[in-house]
């Protein structure tokens, strides 16, 4: 995966938010897998749920569990094939054409049940609006590869949604919730991750940076975003918190990485992998605020942190 709508290449597990929306999820899971048109899905959701947050959750659940990430389309977009470009004379014409484009993309996604990030976001927006809920597609940068550590976010490569619920904007990313690209099979596999539904903006910004900074819904500069480590899906779904180091770049002069992490449970195993060294090493968890990871004289490369064999975060070693 490269830069366009990259789905982080590891399993995204979910457990944190299950209780709040368990009943909604269970009901939506009994819905048909396909409909003749979106109105069929909208009608079911309208009949089953009254609260706007439940309606949005139902949309999110159905889209994330039925729309497959389209790796072929992603490859085409990366080389400039399949891009739709339109011209406009003024803002009014631009708004009209953008609305038409998003509606067409949403309908195409609904029928084919295949998409990259823009298709997921367009469908979430379209279905939410049909249910009377204000929703917007947000464009920006997804921090999804270790090479991005230290890089200022540039051209938009990802899309997600803002939905206006109970007087405030909430952030959701159905693309990251849908699943992952398996490194073993090099194909998409559904694996629902509910952590990206109504995520706290202070967490969401750890790997999302919008082109229009009003969609941060918090305070974070591009430089601060660039300096962050790379966080993976399990970091969010398991509600881990790395308190140190706050920077994603570790100096080789330190000759060690001192890790402080919250959220581990009794029996958890934390391992680390140094890109310039063979094999995994198990960390001593006697002091979770002071986990020492020796860098063994490394002057470059990456440190990957795993909990129970799931990757959590990566740091870069550089001056």
Residue map of PLM features:
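Residues embedded in well-ordered secondary-structure elements
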Residues: 48, 150-152, 294
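Alpha-helical and coiled-coil interaction segments, frequently adjacent to or embedded
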Residues: 182-319
């Amino acid at each position: 995966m490269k830069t366009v709508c990259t789905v982080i290449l590891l399993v995204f597990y979910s457990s944190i938010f299950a209780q709040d929306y368990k009943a909604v999820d269970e009901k939506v899971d009994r819905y048909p897998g396909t409909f003749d048109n979106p109105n069929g899905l909208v009608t079911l959701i309208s009949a089953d749920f009254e609260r706007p947050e439940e309606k949005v959750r139902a949309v999110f659940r159905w889209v994330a569990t039925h729309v497959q990430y389209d790796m072929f389309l992603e490859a085409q977009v990366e080389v400039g094939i399949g891009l739709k470009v339109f011209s406009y004379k003024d803002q009014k014409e631009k708004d009209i054409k953008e609305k038409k484009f998003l509606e067409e993309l949403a309908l195409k996604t609904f029928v084919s049940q295949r998409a990259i990030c823009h298709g997921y976001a367009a469908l979430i927006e379209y279905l939410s609006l049909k249910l009377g809920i204000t929703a917007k597609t947000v464009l920006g940068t997804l921090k999804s590869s270790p090479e991005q550590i230290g890089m200022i976010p540039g051209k938009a490569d990802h899309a997600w949604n803002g939905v206006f619920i109970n007087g405030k904007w909430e952030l959701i990313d159905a693309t990251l919730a849908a699943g992952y690209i398996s490194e073993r099979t090099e194909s998409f596999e559904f694996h629902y991750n509910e952590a990206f539904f109504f995520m706290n903006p202070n967490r969401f910004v750890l790997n999302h940076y919008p082109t229009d900074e009003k969609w941060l819904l918090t305070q974070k500069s591009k430089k601060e975003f660039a300096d962050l480590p790379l966080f993976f899906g399990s970091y969010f779904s398991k509600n881990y918190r790395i308190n140190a180091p706050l920077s994603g770049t570790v100096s080789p002069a330190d000759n060690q990485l001192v890790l402080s992490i919250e959220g581990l449970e009794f029996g958890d195993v934390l391992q680390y992998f140094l890109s310039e060294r063979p094999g995994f090493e198990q960390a001593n968890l006697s002091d979770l605020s002071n986990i020492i990871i020796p860098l063994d004289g490394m002057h470059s490369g990456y440190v990957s942190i795993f909990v129970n064999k799931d990757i959590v975060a990566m740091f870069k070693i550089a001056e």
